[in-house]
Amino acid sequence: MVYIGAESGSDKVLTMVNKGETRQQLIDGVKKLEAAGLKTSVTFISGLAGPELWEEHAIETGTMIAEMNASYVSLLTLMLQPPAPMLEDYKAGRFTLLTPEEVLAETCLMLKYARPSKPCVFRSNHASNYVSLRGNLPMDNESMIASLKRCMEDRGLLKDERFRML
């Protein structure tokens, strides 16, 4: 298995975080690995784009998941820790974190577009996430979206911030 930290499907976001790779390079890499018989596990970061680009981040990530056809996809939620440059941007007011509800809305939108042509194991069960999700794309997209919407309506279902630390 090859693990790939793609972070986002948006070239704007990838540039913003100095990823050093483009969306197309990441897609091509996953496709080559899968074609060679190697399973891939690709990780994306919820909340990475902030409030200005969250919709683009969600849609472009969802369509990237659909296009790359990885064996596994997982989501983590952004947590700013030293020495991350984004932490300094946050402290200086140049970057704003999404609220938990905004992170869930972003994930719903991403799942709407994450329709790979072959089954893909999806996990969002990392300690950083407000809600744990597990399913198979595209078969379980609607049930995962429904779970997220329930959590958006009842904040008591969200993981407490104290338990999101790594």
Predicted regions and their residues:
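Auxiliary Fe-S-binding modules of radical SAM enzymes
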Residues: 66-166
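Ser/Thr-centric signal marking residues that sit
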Residues: 40, 61, 77
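Short, small-residue-enriched loops and turns at beta-alpha junctions
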Residues: 47-53, 81, 130
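Structural preference for beta-strand elements that scaffold enzyme active sites
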Residues: 1-3, 39-43, 72, 119-123
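Short glycine/proline-centered loop/turn elements that form peptide/ligand docking sites
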Residues: 44-47, 77
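Conserved non-cysteine loop/helix-boundary elements of the Radical SAM core domain that shape
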Residues: 1-37, 48-68, 88-101
